[in-house]
Structures are given as structure tokens and as C-alpha cells.
């Protein structure tokens, strides 16, 4: 269900809550969806997590709508400028709002979003590249005072996902969200 369809989304959330679900993540793919988050959050029987991709302004909209948890993939939000220098404005603005709202953040890194310099260093989205990316992004948040962080590392390779999370657990005390990306059978 598209999150834009508030009625259908709330029906799904209600069914999940009736069956014991305690928290629901909803996709926030665009501004149109972002404009409906206040209504969705207000009517939801359980806390919601805003799943943000590509545009940090969607995360700001979610926080303004009362969401207290975000899932972001900084590799998709942070971009380099023409001089190949990282533009930190998105993370600066977002961190300030996260702190003001006392929100938590799940930093999600996956094999499709590993930064070019790490791909060059490791040759492919290896477990080491995934972990270095995740630690880089948690550091961006920590440097700005954000500490309510959990980390998710996923690869289309189950073995790489396991290796990356084992390596991550040796390097940080942040909670780890375990999951599989690109789940399901091929069509």
C-alpha cells in the first residue's frame, strides 16, 4: 500500500496492531506523502518509524509530524558537490531537528549505497566496506550530538550480511537491527 493512501495504510497498521505489532515503519518516498504524515501519525494506534530515502527534507517533515523515529540511509542523502567535497548541510540540519525532537535514528547501510571511495578501496561492497560506511555515518551523527542510534547493515548476500554484522558488533555498542535486503523469491 502506498503511504499516500492514508485510509489503506491505517487499515494495515490497525491489523498489524491487532496481531501484536508494537511499531510500524512506513515509507516516505516523496513530498506528497510527507504532507500526510501528521494525519497518519495522529491516527496510528502504534508508534511509527519514517523510512526516508534520498531527501533529508522528508525526515524533517516526519519529525515535524510528530514521528520520534527515523530510518535513514545517509549514503543516499549525503552528496558531494562539484569540488568533490561532501555537503554536510543535510546532516547538520537533520541532526539539529533530531535532537530537538528527542528522536532516534536507524542508520541503514546496504550494498547498493556504499560510497564510491569505499568501493574503490575494497573493490566491491564487502562486509568491511559496509561496516566502514556505517561507522562513518554514525560518526557524522555523533559529531552533531545525536546518540540515539541503531545500525542496520544489509547485503544481497546473506553471508556478507552476517559477516558485516559480526564485524560491526566488534566495533560499536550501538544496537544492531538485523534484516535481509532484497528478500523473497526471484520472479
Short names for language-model regions:
Residues 1, 22-26, 46-52, 70-72, ...:
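Hydrophobic faces of well-ordered beta-strands that scaffold small-molecule active sites
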Residues 1, 35-43, 103-123:
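N-terminal small/glycine-rich loop or linker at the start of catalytic domains
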Residues 1-8, 27-29, 46-54, 80-81, ...:
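Active-site mouth loops of central-metabolism enzymes
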Residues 8-16, 24-65:
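N-terminal active-site wall of soluble small-molecule enzyme domains
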Residues 31-52, 89-103, 164-178:
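Alpha-helix-loop-beta-strand connector modules within alpha/beta enzyme cores
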Residues 46, 54-104:
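Hydrophobic or amphipathic alpha-helical targeting/insertion segments
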Residues 113, 118-187:
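Catalytic alpha/beta core domains of metabolic enzymes, predominantly
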Amino acid at each position: 500500500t502506498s503511504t499516500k493512501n492514508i485510509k489503506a495504510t491505517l487499515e494495515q497498521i490497525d491489523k498489524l496492531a491487532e496481531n501484536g505489532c508494537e511499531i510500524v515503519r512506513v515509507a516516505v518516498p516523496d513530498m506528497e506523502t510527507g504532507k500526510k504524515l501528521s494525519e497518519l501519525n495522529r491516527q496510528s494506534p502504534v508508534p511509527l518509524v519514517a523510512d526516508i530515502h534520498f531527501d533529508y527534507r522528508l525526515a524533517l517533515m516526519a519529525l515535524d509530524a510528530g514521528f520520534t523515529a527515523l530510518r535513514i540511509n545517509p549514503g543516499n542523502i549525503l552528496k558531494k558537490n562539484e569540488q568533490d567535497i561532501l555537503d554536510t548541510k543535510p546532516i547538520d540540519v537533520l541532526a539539529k531537528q533530531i535532537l530537538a525532537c528527542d528522536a532516534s535514528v536507524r542508520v541503514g547501510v546496504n550494498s547498493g549505497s556504499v560510497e564510491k571511495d569505499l568501493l574503490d578501496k575494497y573493490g566491491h561492497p564487502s562486509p568491511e566496506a559496509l561496516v566502514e560506511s556505517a561507522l562513518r555515518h554514525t560518526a557524522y551523527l555523533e559529531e552533531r550530538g545525536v546518540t540515539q542510534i541503531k545500525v542496520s547493515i544489509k547485503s544481497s548476500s546473506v553471508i556478507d550480511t552476517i559477516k558485516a554484522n559480526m564485524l560491526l558488533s566488534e566495533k560499536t555498542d550501538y544496537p544492531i537491527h538485523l534484516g535481509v535486503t532484497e528478500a523473497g523469491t526471484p520472479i
